[in-house]
Amino acid sequence: MRCLYLHGFASGPGSAKGVAFAEAFARRGVEVERLNLRVPSLAHLRLSAMIDHVVATIGAAEQVVLIGSSLGGLTAARVAERVPAVRALVLLAPAFCMAERWRARLGDDGAAWRRDGSIEVFDHAERRPARVDVGFLDDAAATDVGWPTVTAPTW
């Protein structure tokens, strides 16, 4: 059975959580593949592309477990809706209804994001400021509609 770790927003496969999961599972003889979900890039991040990337990575696998943190948790749940090979999910603070919550929280900053076309965020993987275009928010709003319908056991 394959086990994939999906990192959160502005993070990467080398995140502390991803490394901790990989090391803990390795001690038990299980390899955790830590995917890079910065697709096509952090600047032009798209939830739909993240989901497609995970689906393509799973490919013809018969069984897979997805571990997702924040945006990676949302991605994992949306993948599980589409891929019967997902046998279980471990979700850490999944970012369900993310676009809706971000719009409410950002207020004037959200309006500036739309006006300017991008917003500055802290890139945790690169440890520096970076910009993400507003297409990320629009794509998330179109892709993350309603609560995910997941039938796989979820923790």
Describe these PLM feature segments.
Residues A85-W155:
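The alpha/beta-hydrolase serine catalytic core
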Residues I67-A76:
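Gly/Ala-rich beta-loop-alpha elbow adjacent to hydrolase catalytic centers
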Residues R78-R82:
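Active-site signature of alpha/beta-hydrolase-fold catalytic machinery across serine-
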Residues K17-G18, R46-M50, R101-W102:
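Residues at alpha-helix caps and immediate loop-helix transition turns in enzyme cores, especially N-
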Residues I58-E62, V83, V150:
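Glycine-rich phosphate-binding loop signature in dinucleotide/nucleotide-binding domains
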